[in-house]
Amino acid sequence: MPTLQKAAASIDDTVEGAMSATLLSLLGVTAKSEKGAAGTNDKVEWLRSQLIGKDVEFDTPFGRRALTYADQTASGRSLSYIEDYLVKQVLPFYGNTHTDDSHVGSKTTRLVHKAASYIKRCMGAGAGDALIFCGAGTTAAIKRLQEIIGVALPSVEMRNRLSAQLRAEERWVVFVGPYEHHSNLLSWRQSLAEVVEVGVDADGLVDVAALRRALGSPEYADRPMLGSFSACSNVTGVMTDTREIARVLHQHGAFACFDFAASGPYVKIDMKSGAADGYDAVFLSPHKFVGGPGTPGILLMNKSLYKLNSQPPSTCGGGTMAYVNGFNEEVSKQIKHHCQDTLYYDDIEEREDAGTPPILQKIRASLAFWVKEYVGYDTMDLHERLFSEMAMKRLLHNPNVMVLGNTNAHHIPIFSFLIYPSVTVKEKPFDAFGEPSCDKQLETMKHKQLSLHGRFVTRLLNDLFGIQARGGCACAGPYGHTLLNVDNELSLCIRSAVLEGYSGLKPGWTRLSFSYYLSKEEFKFILSAIEFIATYGHRFLSLYKFDWITGN
């Protein structure tokens, strides 16, 4: 594979101001280069060769194990390809942006602008869309949108006071789906908005009929409305039909916003702003992309959602204003100059990028997008459909494994499961008359009524096999209640126990991912490990001590 270092030799030869220029033209590579001609398997093999940590080993209670990573839904893996480029080609010329007067300032500013332009192109953004980099992931992106539309509040006390003063037609109504990560649910609940939670239908999918009814309710008429739905469950991998949801929301005058944190690394995201089935805002966590750790969160939004044009930006700081007076607004009133003390930029992307921007993080994010585009959606889909079908077939046929969610729905290969171990029970046989027989005791297999703790299974995957998975509720507690059939009474009992300090009683599961760049050997190894634990995992219980306080 050609290196980015060689390709980057053309950076300084790039024609300034060329309308078609992208970050990739700065790097001297495009999707149609010789990389694009490589075969599907060659691309994935190359990607695996660049994974940082692919040959790492670590010590476990059972000896040294090779690390096998299957926690891509939580965070992706870094790539030598990207990190080497940053170290050798960006950092030597690194300088703060907001200036063209120095070589490093000019070059860094240019790279950052090209990085943003390339990401917008990959996401189908148009002239009416704004890209804002926020914090470290989707959580910050959602919070930024809440600040922009004026519903974010610093405290619950302030929320209660202000909510009572708002007229009904002023208060936002926000519709959320059943799969939501806590970041796309709790922050809305704590905002000024009225939150309407849409549940699942009989198939465990978003109840679109219920959404239609809620949107058409007279109590929400003439009020600003917004839907904020997960594009894919980070627990089950079940995909939401975002186009259908967008159409339904738009038909009722609501904005359509989607959280692509779980599926963003693998699916095409096309804003289609202004279309009936287009998106008005997308939240994204590029750190979940392969090559993405160390990237910022992304909010791509239609400018019609921006409510701060005549006000200061959501965060004030350097690089957001055109001019600041030597006196503040109160002084200007005293001297009869009724004007604001600060002139902020009109451009949304400039005014919402206060202070030193996440320079390396933005460039790294664009490179992670490039890797995604280079591998190609057909390649990713082919590998993931194969992994999903094979994994589902083996796991569903194992009587000790229960895969959560609708296993027939369209989904990406994110699997959350419970293990109900079978145990050998010795029973005395009976004769034809129902009397105890003198024959030798028979051994029968019976299934326990309780599953192994999700975090215990995760520890066994780690300790026995070196497999990195995740135990718990995956920050999707309300959806977990649905999946595990936890009713209100049981939920309150669990809450009471947690209040007493027993966090270990919280229900959960084991989750892992079969990302497209796993090797076939790794894929089969992970499945075999699950099957081993499903058969023998309970025998290791005596070797572990459970902490009811922490859940460790």
Predicted regions and their residues:
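Pyridoxal 5′-phosphate
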Residues: P2-N552
